[in-house]
Amino acid sequence: MVELAEYARTEINRIGGYYAYSKELINGDSIYDFDVTKLSIHTRDIGLAGIEVYDLLRDEYDIQAEFGDLGNILAYLSIGDRQREVERLVSALAEIKRRFSRDKSTLMDFDYIDPIVAMSPQEAFYGEKESLPIRETAGRVCSEFVMCYPPGIPILTPGEQI
C-alpha cells in the first residue's frame, strides 16, 4: 500500500497545479513523519479551493475524498484500493484541472485571524445562553462550537468574541 500511495503522489504531482506532499517535508524538527496512506493534495494553484475539488470529485466523478478546505483535499488509501482506484483519482484530478481551473488570483486569500478570547471555554459553554440569528451576534461571546462539516474544523469556539 505504501508503494501505491507514493505512486499516487508522483502521478498527482505530474499533472501540474496540484501538490501532494511526501517525505520531502520531514525535517526532524517540526515534522517527524506522516501517514503515507493519506493523500493531502494542495489545490489552490489550479485556482480552485479544496472544497470545490472535493465537491467535483464527489458529484462529477463519484469519488469520495475525506474532506476539503480552503486550499486542500484529503484522500485516504485503504487495503481495498488498487491501482485502478488510484488511476481514477489521478484521471479525475487531471480532468478537473482541464475543465474547471481558473486564475488563482480569484481565490480568497486566507490569513489566520487571532481570535478575541472573552472568557474561558468552560465559562462560555456552561454559562447562560441566548439563541440569536447570526446577523445579531457581532460583539457577543460564542457559547458553542460553530463549524462546517466536513471537515468539522471549528470556525468559532466557546469563549471567543464573534
Regions found by a protein language model. Name each.
Residues 13, 20-161:
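Conserved C-terminal alpha-helix-loop-beta "cap" of PLP-dependent enzymes
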Residues 1-7, 85:
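Structural signature of PLP-dependent enzymes
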